[in-house]
Amino acid sequence: MVALRPPGLPLPGRANLARALAAPVSVARALPGPGRLARALRHELTHPDRRPRRIWHEDGAAHIELIGVARTGGPSAHAAVSDALRRLAGVDWAEVDEGLGRVLVGFDGDQVEVSDLVDTVGDVERALHAEEGQGPGPARLAERHPAEADPLLAETIALAVDTAAFGVALTGRFVRLPSAPRAAGAIVAVVDGQPRLRAALADRIGPATTDLALGFASAWVGALTQQPDVLAVAVVGRLARIAELRAGALAFGRRATELTADTGRRSGPDDGQPGPGGPDGGSGGPPGAGRGGPGGAAWRGRPVPLPDGPVEVASARLAAAGLALGGAGLVVGRSPRLAGELVLAALPRAARAGREMFAATAGRRLAARGIVPLDARCLRRLDRVDTVMVCASALLGERVRVLSATDAQTWDRAETMLGHLDPRRSFRPGEVVARAGGTRLVAAHDAGRRRAADPAGLPLLVRTGSVSAGALAGVTLDGHAEAVLRAARGCGRVVLTEHASVADIAGLADVTLPPAPRPRQAAGARPSRREAGLAAQVHRLQAAGAVVCVVADEEGDEALRAADVGVGLARAGRRPPWSADLLCGSELTDVWRVLRFMPPAAATSRRAATLSVSGSALAALTTFVNGPGARPSARRLALVSGPVSAAAATAVVTGLVAALRADRGAVPAPVLHTDWHALTAEAALRRLGAATGADTRPAGQRPTAQPTAQPAPRVAAAAPPRGRAPPPAQRGPGARRVAPRAGP
């Protein structure tokens, strides 16, 4: 026999062959045993702070993950991190956002490197840990950055495991292989179905790790007990979650340049106007506790625990019923198998699956429209929202308008001169706002700096020579402001912050709050959440039992931070409200779409909870009827587990259809709120043309009209503030107080 070998390679002798054969054995001996592996795995799961720090950066903006005390230590720890970064040359802006669990930094890449920022954060963390005497500090919380790939990777692995388990279960069922008793999954079911046990495990290893661990255990049990119906529902849920995560990452990728370009900017174009986090605050103070954890009074600094929704109520009741039925089966029937099957029958699988499918589909559709999910868990709380707080600044447009004037001539003159004024430019008392010929508009407030966009507006004096007349400047309403308030009314109670410029639509709100004062404080500091006006209002509503959704731009950042669901508007040229859960664009139509999902979310959860209770009741009944001595068979398995699986599948389909229907609605036509009675004919035509895009030139000079798919705007007259009659000068001859609206 001829041995084939490469040239120059000698054939191994017996000694070499023996050593080669013994090598795998020595390697196996060097590997840790199962017990050591289990201890190491437990150590890694319970100390997630040992994994590498997550960092995202692009074009002069960086989001750096915080670890330990730097993240959970409250305002003082957050201030230490941001102050250390601000001291670096080239850093324009730095602020900790506990919603993301990161410090957000705007910097000049030519002066400072990202590695320098990370090193500075690490130095502060080590100093804080040394002061606290806690070693490496507390473990990380569970928040995820939308650009991270870890959640998508974890869900993909879980999908692969569930799919493999489904194949094993289906193959075993077809070839009639022996299966493990269905009751073998009772232990996993007890941990998964008992809210307290699940919460204790989540506190130990984190909510995301808990979901994965229980998912893997359920897949393993489903494969051994040959339950492809259960695994099929799990696979569909994983697919929906993966689609949601991928859509969210793509949405952030599309808008990253736009969002990070404005990260270091002030809230207004005028350098004299402090932005969020500046001397006049308004970005909201971080609480001692962040957004970590699924519930409880410490979650987001809530004054009381988050109220239970239909899914939580059904889960708690079924958990108690499952333990009671399992105990009865064990004591009365003296059958561990019967007890385990009764526990499995009480699993709230349909309730969770229905809400999860609705939330995942809603997140995917919103992300496809450019809405960035900074914290997608808020979509799982949409079914509990019963109060919507709208910050009036989010409803404003981009043009200055006259709210009131001494007489009609003053109104017309001021309206003409204010046409190109930036509504967020601030003025000192006596400063000239605009000038035209011999007429000047002068700021007439008492002290400080004021803007037309401020809640009380900008008082003006119209001076022509020695003659002066008074006027009040405000901001036009966004065309979809009324649609947002009407959509909010469909969610429950509507709370609106008081603002002179939104008085026309304030009647759509149930409660009008006075504008929150802007507290004075040291530069670089941020107001405490308890001291911040809007955040305090949110906490008062929460203490009264409400689940609050806040709609705001960057001026309501502290309210977004305290809200149960925060919907933020990222206006062009201004810093995005990173404290929001859902980051919309500059159009209110995005907010309208988010609010449209809330009533169907509540209805879907109620329907899923009803299906879950009904399926569990039927499954428990069939289990009792079959008795502990029934022989295992396909028919018996279908009778025992079929109702729960059928209820879960129905809930999944219901959630999917409900979310798609909620997303399908057409955007309403914009409504134009204008003081038509106070305008001249030429001014009215100009205003209408600017708002609708219509051509106001003479008919002979207009091009041929082209068809458009955009809805025509509705026209409404601006109403005076409630309780205040307009001065006679605001009404032209024969004008009515409120003009009728033209249809679309």
Model-predicted segments: where are they?
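Extended, compositionally biased intrinsically disordered regions at domain boundaries
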Residues: 2-62
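Acidic, Ser/Thr-rich low-complexity segments on the non-lumenal side of membrane proteins
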Residues: 61-81, 383-405, 693-698
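Cytosolic-side membrane-insertion boundary helix
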Residues: 132-175, 179, 307, 593-619
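Short acidic amphipathic segments
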Residues: 50-52, 57, 61-111, 123, ...
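Short, charged/polar, Gly/Pro-enriched secondary-structure boundary elements
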Residues: 72, 110-115, 442, 447-449
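Conserved short beta-strand edge segments in small beta-sheet-based binding/regulatory domains
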Residues: 56, 119, 123-144
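Hydrophobic alpha-helical transmembrane segments
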Residues: 165-387, 392, 398, 409, ...
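Conserved ATP-binding TGD loop and adjacent catalytic N/P-domain core of P-type ATPases
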Residues: 445-649, 656-724, 732-734
